[in-house]
Structure formats: C-alpha cells, structure tokens
Amino acid sequence: IDKYVKTGKARFVYRHFAFLGPESGWAAEAANCANAQDKFWQYHDYLFNYIWDNYYAKGKSGENVGAFAKDNLKKFAADLGLDTAKFNSCLDSGKYADAVAKETEEGRQAGVNGTPATFVNGRLISGAVPFSQFEAAVEAALSGNK
C-alpha cells in the first residue's frame, strides 16, 4: 500500500465476497455500517482477528456457527466505540444487503471462488500469496505487461 497506493502508482479497491452463508453476508453488511462511521478498517480487522483467535487458531471452523451472528456484530461495534444506535439501526435495516450481494455476484462472474482474491490489472491472484507475488504483478502492470 505504501509503495504503490500512497504514491499514486496504483489504486486499491476493497470488495466483499460473502460466499460462506448468511453470517459472512451479515459481517460484510456490518463492515459497511462501520464504514458509515469511518471505521471500516478497524471493524474489518476486528472481525478477522476475532475469527482467527477464537476459531481458526484453535483448529475450528468459524463458518455459520454464530461467530458473526447479528448480536455479536453489534457487540463488536460497541467494543470499537461506534455509535451503537446508528450501527444497530443500519445493520437491522439490511441497507447494504443488496450491495454485498452484488459485489459477491460480480466476484463470481470474475472467477473468484474463495478468499482472499486480488485482481491486479484484471489478472486474478487467488489465495494468500507472498507480497513478492503481488509486487511482481503490480510492477508488470506498471511497465505495460500483463
């Protein structure tokens, strides 16, 4: 990010890919509700740390077992100091459900079938890969090579 985005050489666009059932959709909606209070990345990071610490690091699946039930998502917002009345109203309204569904469908149409998935100049890089692989793809795009 520092080397390419902050210098204006590249653009970073985050899109949700909520493919693991209802809880992943609610989590994406909740992140958008946090974004309405300028806390997207804090909320995003909280969710990823929570699921890692409480499930994946213990060898358990956190998928649709209540980890991202709406009550928990609301508690996380409170933990981060968000305006809970606004956040809860936003999440309960389903205000971002269509946007999350649209981003997920666009991802499917582009060939995404899991996360993380990253596109560099239209080329899909699937899975967690070393930074050097991203760097090579960005450098190739900047030099005009796909």
What do the PLM-derived regions correspond to, one by one?
Residues 1-78, 110, 140-141:
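Structural alpha/beta surface segment adjacent to cysteine/selenocysteine redox centers
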Residues 1-6, 65-146:
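C-terminal cap of thioredoxin/glutaredoxin-like
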